[in-house]
């Protein structure tokens, strides 16, 4: 949807897509479910480096995503995909991201959501939208709470989009 809207506006905005393209990593300390699986059966207190492996859920290759964009006539130079775990790619790439109008977070888990907020939220323009796809999952909600506490700001009022998981706020 964002790529289509951007195309209709002459591709004036850069669209960044960060994804592991390996699936969702293993849940951690603040998560109460392993997304897509349910009960957590691994050591969620293990070091992050040991949990940055795919749980096997929601795996789409970068090539298939580019193919889908291309087939719909949406893939152009305004779109940049970054492959890898957020914890590994954001520290290296975030400086290249300029102001953000819409930040959509779909990290599913605490650590994925928190690292995205740490590196990308400061770049969200005043009046920009922040969408948290999985806000009702404990890990995502706690990540939002912890992030805003760390920057000494109140947690923004979250507005539910779909009557379920997806929530957003305006900066």
List where the protein language model places each region.
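S-adenosylmethionine/decaboxylated-SAM
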Residues: 1-171
């Amino acid at each position: 949807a964002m790529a289509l809207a951007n195309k209709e506006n002459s591709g004036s905005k850069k669209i960044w897509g960060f994804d592991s393209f390996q699936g969702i990593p293993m849940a951690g300390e603040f998560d109460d479910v392993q997304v897509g699986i349910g009960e957590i059966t691994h050591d969620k207190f293990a070091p992050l480096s040991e949990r940055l492996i795919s749980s096997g859920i929601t795996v789409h290759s970068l090539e298939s995503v580019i193919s889908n964009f291309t087939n719909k006539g949406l893939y152009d130079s305004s779109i940049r995909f970054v492959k890898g775990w957020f914890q590994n790619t954001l520290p290296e790439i975030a400086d290249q991201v300029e102001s953000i109008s819409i930040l959509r977070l779909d990290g599913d888990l605490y650590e994925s959501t928190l690292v995205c907020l740490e590196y990308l939220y400061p770049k969200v323009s005043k009046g920009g939208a922040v969408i948290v796809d999985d806000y009702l999952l404990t890990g995502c909600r706690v990540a939002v709470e912890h992030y805003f506490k760390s920057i000494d700001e109140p947690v923004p009022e979250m507005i539910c989009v779909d009557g379920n998981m997806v929530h957003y706020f305006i900066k």
